[in-house]
């Protein structure tokens, strides 16, 4: 908001949406309306401009030591996802809901390879391909395996953090290994600091 000159009686005239308002004491009503949101840079869900930009890079999504034997539901760039480590210690990051009956894979079972749904037991590899479809007629299983996929994203572990790439697979960049992250005699210790706000507000606060 653009401030004009100070007025008497402890008031302030402020231009808001091309309308002058006079703020004095008890101005809760005048101030309750938040500033318009710049959708172009604040919205980061699938299909948004900022979201598509962010999806061309690797992002830290979880601390490795905090991922146990059970799948974990997380939300990254506006997407509901499930992160897990199978019994062969492979990482998987997949869409939250099974493509069969939309059951949450947060309650899935980590297998030797991949994860299986707790509802009907459909079994998926870490890349989203189907390994088993129990309960389906034998003559339909090959067709289902060819035509149905669970959405999945590449992951990478580095310095105690799990990173993910959520963009088009053909545009996936190499994972960046910066010299500044590898000092002799120093150990990186990952940590997290949750902020209940938009990413842009965090950036404004630290720049």
Q: For the regions a protein language model found, what residue spans apply to each?
A:
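Rieske [2Fe-2S] iron-sulfur-binding subdomain
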Residues: 1-91, 111, 125-207
């Amino acid at each position: 908001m653009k401030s004009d000159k100070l007025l008497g009686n402890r008031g302030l005239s402020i231009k808001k949406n091309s309308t002058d308002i006079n703020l004095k004491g008890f101005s809760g009503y005048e101030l309750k309306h938040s500033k318009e949101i710049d959708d172009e840079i604040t919205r980061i869900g699938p299909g948004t401009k900022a979201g598509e930009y962010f999806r061309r890079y690797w992002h830290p999504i979880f601390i490795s030591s905090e991922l146990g034997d059970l799948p974990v539901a997380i939300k990254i760039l506006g997407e509901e996802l499930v992160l897990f480590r199978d019994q062969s210690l492979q990482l998987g990051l997949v869409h939250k809901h099974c493509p069969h009956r939309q059951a949450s894979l947060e309650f899935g079972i980590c297998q030797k390879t991949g994860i299986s749904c707790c509802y009907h037991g459909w079994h998926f590899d870490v890349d989203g391909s189907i390994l088993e479809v129990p309960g389906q007629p034998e003559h339909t299983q090959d067709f289902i395996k060819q035509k149905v996929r669970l959405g999945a994203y590449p992951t990478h572990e580095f310095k105690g953090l799990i990173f993910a790439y959520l963009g088009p697979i053909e545009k996936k960049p190499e994972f960046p290994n910066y010299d500044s992250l590898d000092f002799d005699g120093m150990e990186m210790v990952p940590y997290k600091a949750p902020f209940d706000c938009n990413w842009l507000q965090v950036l404004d606060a630290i720049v």
